[in-house]
Amino acid sequence: MRITVVGGGNIGTQFMVHCASKGHDVTAYTSKPEVFGSHLNIVDENEVTTLEGDIRKATNDPSEAFSDADFIMITLPSSMMRDIASVIYEHARPDAIIGVVPGNGGSECAFGKSIERGNTFFAIERVPAIARLVVKGRTVRSMGYRGELHVASLPASEVDRCCELISSIYDKPCKPIPNYLNLTMTPSNPILHTTRLRTIFGDYKPGVVYDSLPLFYEEWDDASSRLLIACDEEEQSICKALPEFRLEFVKSLRIHYESPTVEAMTAKISWIPAFRGLTTPSVEVDGKYIPDLHSRYFTADFSYGLSIIKQIGVFAGVDTPNIDETLDWYERIRIEQGDFSYSDYGINDFDDFRKFYLR
């Protein structure tokens, strides 16, 4: 299969190695093709190679990358999806399969024109494993592979075919998700990160500085858990208001973390070994600290995460006061502009919304 991977970062490089190791004809579409060698490898935490393979080429020419691709996998941030979707629509075949990872962030709407003309679009719910570049264009470290991957597609009738493809590349079982909206509403980062940031920086405005900041997860507190649970409950109310979309895979964070109470949630999140030592996104100024408003925790998880959940709540007719207050807080302090909006893609009311996702 001719596979083009868009993005030469952590996840993109990992995906290239998995595809190349299976004998696929792999092209990297990247802004810096000159840094790529033909031989790529994955190493573990001990720097031991666990997987390797050869790609055909790296290029920044969209015609070279997409015109003969059978499968295009995109590993870019949500904010870049609209631009890359236009490029792919212009250069790719109408029968090419187009995938993204991870599946939240509204990327499906950017590819609406491609879906309409016949392209199958799908997403993997979450990244298959932790990936960190060791040498750009050559080596990536991968750890913590998920035991099972979840995939949804538009149209939904193609999900089994997409699952088979991803399962064959990663050698992992792949579970088909009945409706793509389950991926759009994945609550992990859009609720986990945003509620914690609001709790830590709730009093922030230009001029306010902090002598010190808590570790983001390891020093998680009850106030953060209380807001997280409130926003999570609001999202679950949205899911209950949309029964025909089969949103049973939008799992409550209380179930995901096995923490039904505020106190249990605090204990669980502050204990998770993979979260230990992770700092709060901040910038040091004269020995003090201010929030790093350019961090993806802000720019992605509010604008392409919690904001989308809010918009779906409006379509469903569900009030979301805690989500609203959290978004209003961010609006007062934000630096970077540009949010995902369904209206940008002609989805202006519930009928438009229903037509898009129930296909």
PLM feature segments, named:
Residues M1-E47:
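NAD(P)+-binding Rossmann beta1-loop-alpha1 motif at the extreme N-terminus of oxidoreductases
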Residues G7, T30, L76, P102, ...:
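Short beta-strand/turn micro-motifs composed of small residues
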Residues G23, A69, R93-D95, G118, ...:
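A general structural motif
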Residues T50-A92:
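Rossmann-like NAD(P)-binding element
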Residues T27-Y29, T59, M73, G99, ...:
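Hydrophobic/aromatic beta-strand patches that form the interior of the parallel beta-sheet core
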Residues Y204-D211, E218, S225-R359:
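NAD(P)-dependent Rossmann-like dehydrogenase/reductase catalytic/cofactor-binding core
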Residues I11, P128-C231:
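Substrate/ligand-engaging "lid" and interaction regions
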Residues S78-T139:
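Rossmann-like NAD(P)(H) cofactor-binding subdomain of soluble oxidoreductases
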